Design a protein with these regions (language model features):
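Polysaccharide-binding surfaces and accessory modules of carbohydrate-active proteins
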Residues: 2-58, 104-107, 111-219, 228, ...
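A eukaryote-biased signal for short, well-structured alpha-helical docking elements
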Residues: 29-31, 39-40, 53-108
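Membrane-interacting alpha-helical segments
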Residues: 89-104, 185-189, 279-282, 287
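Substrate-binding groove/exosite segments of carbohydrate-active enzymes
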Residues: 257-298
Length: 298
């Protein structure tokens, strides 16, 4: 059994727990996926996680990495990736998972392929939304733990690309409530940046770098957890579960409206048509509102 290396953490904070990974985990998880809206973008692996802070993966807002690690597990073990797809309009990433066989020292806790996870992720107005649906396909009740581990290093894009800074700002003590954790950092520019990781419903356990849900799933039963990661936002916001659908609808409508203004290219070659459609969708995902108008971010 291979254990994922711990990501770097801020001074004075606990390292998020590693999730055990069975040898059958697909190499597909190393293929990167990208989501973006305005000044916020995420570079994720194919499972929708942020697992390698030493590379480009992360959630970025206005050129600062607000999440350097984010991973989901079942009973402390990474689920097995079945499929991963970014929608044709680039509005959302959808991933499907099954559970590996999970054992303790004496017995099997969960048989393989009886728990299904469906994960949807998108970005809208500085918030990274996630919806994780957990379904029990067995003929008996199953109790399991849905784990989240996270960290924020607040490095800028130049540091991500390898530039070493001789001095950095300071991290603030994490703020922990029953349903969210807020991480904050003040840079040498005296600007404070914050990441608020909100869960809905309230987790069974929550601390600086970890949240855990104790799920009791009836035969063929299911449960849903929503997460909202807010960049430089705090307080007075809607619950993640209510904001998820309205945000996703608004995100798709905005992309469709922008793309509808583009020139349509259609030929007798279906492969070329698909490439042109894909290029237009990619271009409009990169568009960002500036005072001078729409500008593509590369």
């Amino acid at each position: 059994m291979q254990i994922i290396a711990q990501p770097p953490t801020a001074p004075g904070t606990q390292a998020p727990p590693s999730f055990a990974v069975t040898a059958s985990v697909s190499l597909q998880t190393r293929r990167l996926r990208t989501l973006k809206h305005e000044d916020t973008f995420a570079v994720l692996n194919a499972a929708g996680d942020i697992a390698h802070a030493s590379e480009a993966e992360g959630l970025y807002h206005r050129d600062t990495r607000h999440l350097s690690y984010f991973a989901v597990g079942i009973n402390g073990t990474r689920p097995l990736l079945l499929s991963s797809m970014v929608r044709d309009d680039n509005s959302a990433l959808t991933c499907e998972f099954s559970n590996p066989e999970i054992r303790d020292e004496t017995q099997v806790q969960l048989e393989q392929d009886i728990i299904h996870l469906s994960r949807a992720e998108f970005i809208w107005q500085g918030v990274f939304y996630q919806r994780i649906a957990v379904r029990n396909f067995s003929n008996s009740r199953k109790r399991l733990k849905l784990n989240f581990a996270f960290a924020a290093d607040f490095v800028d894009l130049f540091e991500v690309r390898g530039i070493h800074r001789s001095a950095r700002g300071h991290f603030h003590p994490p703020v922990i409530s029953s349903s969210y954790v807020q991480l904050a950092y003040t840079g040498l520019d005296n600007q404070t940046r914050s990441t608020q990781i909100c869960f809905d419903p309230q987790p069974s356990r929550i601390d600086t770098n970890h949240a855990e849900f104790a799920l009791d799933l009836e035969e063929r039963g299911y449960s849903v957890v929503h997460v909202a990661v807010r960049c430089n936002q705090s307080g007075g916001r809607r619950r993640p579960s209510s904001a998820f659908l309205s945000g996703l609808r608004a995100s798709r409508n905005a992309l469709h409206q922008a793309a509808s203004q583009a020139v349509s290219i259609e030929t007798s070659n279906d492969i070329y048509n698909e490439a042109a459609r894909r290029a237009i969708a990619d271009l409009y995902m990169l568009m960002t509102h500036m005072p001078e108008g729409l500008v593509p971010y590369a």
